[in-house]
Amino acid sequence: TPAEVRLKKGDNELRVVFESQAMGDGQFRLQWSGAGFGFEPIAPERLSFAADDAELAQAHRLQQGQHLFAERRCARCHDYALSPRIGESAYGELDQSAPDLRTMGARVHVPWLAAWLREPHTIRPDATMPEFELTDAECDDVAAWLGSLGAPPPAPTFVAEDAAKGRVLFRQLGCVACHQFGEAMAAEPALAARIAIAHVPQKWHASALVAYLRDPRAHHRDVRMPDLRVSATEAHQLAAFLLGGTSAVLPPSRGDAERGRRIAQQQRCGICHDLDLPLDDRPFRRLQNLNPERGCLAEKPHDHDAPNHHLSDEQRASLRAFLAHATTAPFRRAPLDYAQRHLQAQRCTACHGFDGVPSTWARWVAVAGAKEPLPKDQDPVAQGVPALTWVGAKLQPSWLLRFVAGEQASPRPWLTARMPAFARHGGPIVTGL
């Protein structure tokens, strides 16, 4: 029911009683007006809340649990009754894919594959790939088999100026907002949380890296890397820069490919990844019968013959809390909730400020610019990269949907900063905003 209150000088406590609907988003408007201005939304920096509220903490715990449940692809293993419905989940969230491995040998070096299989979270702390209880020899075997799936095309030829131009592009396009590369600047938490990519020379065949930069989704529909729509020349220059970095030489990996194929089948890698392997139909434990203290959620999962997702205590608590809702909540379409979770997962705030918090890119510029003056085309603040605060109230949803999906030309083509395409997750995020 609409109601009005008169604000007094200083802080005001507002109490709103709201009963949400059974399905979809519940919503209401909180506006204000005063001398000289009509009704408008209250700016978020004018509002505060009790961060220690118990109900709010529980809601955040369930929200994180739902995101982890989808991100770690729990439904692919743990509920055959749910599996046929995975594609029916809201926004296809339970149907998130893992990389297609059927041509892995054409893209990635075998020694890196072996290192990744041993300890994925050492290479990338936020990896969604779990660690399996495999010996070093077994990791070498699986890497040898994956490496046999395809051969890399001839490597491109790089010249010195390619890497120099790639370094400029790396800054102009905002790659520094998500990635650490060739720098030792990690004092601020937001900058330290960026993805380190010093291992790129260890991982990629050169031709495959160029192709990946041009089309990140070619072998992974749900890859978190956005499509910056770089040209062939730009991809070539960026690859030259990234492959020119220094990284430790990995020891050679000499495994048995046939043994590796059998191990991959035994570990049921094909449940998450596209692989030309028959699937083992041994059932996993149903969601309703899971012991939340055992298996993947145990403190030591390998003691229970389960993969180790390297979950923190907080993440385990969130997943345990969410399990009771796992067969129903993912099928409710709630775009606001989806947007809140995926603004972080898709790293939207790496380039855009939000609710008064500057973007990671702007923070990087503040630190890097103090050491080395940066030209305007490498500064998101100078270029006017917009904040996301109230973007849903300012822009037409139909236009914004096309823009985020990469189907709408930029209204400011003279800027070097470039909005990437988020064809898979962009629609629900825009709807939520």
Locations of the language-model features?
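Short pre-active-site segment immediately N-terminal to redox-active cysteine/selenocysteine motifs
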Residues: 70-76, 81, 128, 138, ...
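Surface-exposed coil/turn segments at beta-strand junctions on protein surfaces, enriched
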Residues: 7-9, 21-23, 70, 202, ...
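Acidic/polar, compositionally biased interaction segments
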Residues: 1-59, 63
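Extracytoplasmic electron-transfer domains, predominantly the class I c-type cytochrome c fold
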Residues: 85-151, 186-247, 279-331, 359-433
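Electrostatic cytochrome c docking/interface patches
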Residues: 46-70, 148-171, 241-265, 315-344, ...
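Repeat-solenoid scaffold signature
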Residues: 8-13, 18-24, 99, 134, ...
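Conserved, compact domain cores that house catalytic/ligand-binding motifs in diverse enzymes
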Residues: 54-91, 96, 179, 184-187, ...
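Surface-exposed loop/turn motifs at beta-strand-loop junctions within extracellular Ig-like
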Residues: 18-20, 34, 81, 150, ...
